[in-house]
């Protein structure tokens, strides 16, 4: 891998060549005759390539990744696991993460997209819609465990107020209500923990990660207070793309943004085409169109059917283009977990 990084440095070639990697995946996956094993082998190769790219960028000094919050935030934890060799840039807002990627100050941005308990992060979806040069290059699931943190010496009996991000408060609402705590919203879970540490008040606690407790010298009063034991947040990696994402088919997910004509049956016609071509629609979301009252855009996430190809994906897009008012391929990627 070091030789590959050196060659790319000498020739000026990019670390990531989507078309080249897609061709390598296609060629090697075709050697697996067992159709059941083929997608697993393809996913293994894709993960190995991702690790190789991270190492190459570290050698070349090209990797900078942005996140929203402060050290200890869940976005920073996800970033650390996805890009362990990257330089990290902390941003105040999700919009600033997009700006950093758009301007080239960061090659990647890591953002929360959806939580299995609290639902969508709609602001991030809206930012994706309003940044046409940004794509989703990767998606991963991170198990979330919310802990109640306080200064040393505090107990559950001394706590009166709990501060945290609204989603963390929502995920832990049963625990909070059972103890009769007042709540105060904060912009970020890790920053809430830092605030509690600075207050040094045994009546105030934060809901945040165990990693945050270690960073800010807090104790864990109660671990795993989120109501859903399987609480998981889905994070996306965004990049600025010079070209459309490379579609390879089997083993991939496609993320699409589109608008439908404001006529009866137009949305149904688009969804019918997706099903008719064998693509499984994992989710559909609607959001208000900016500056167009009471009209909406749609986000759909599709699983490519087994044995499908890039050509099959393109055929679907061509068909949808004739049905939809606007259509944008937001991403073509694999879904993985940050904990294996």
Briefly describe each language-model feature range.
Residues 1-340:
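Domain-level signature for soluble enzymes in the chorismate/prephenate branch of the shikimate pathway
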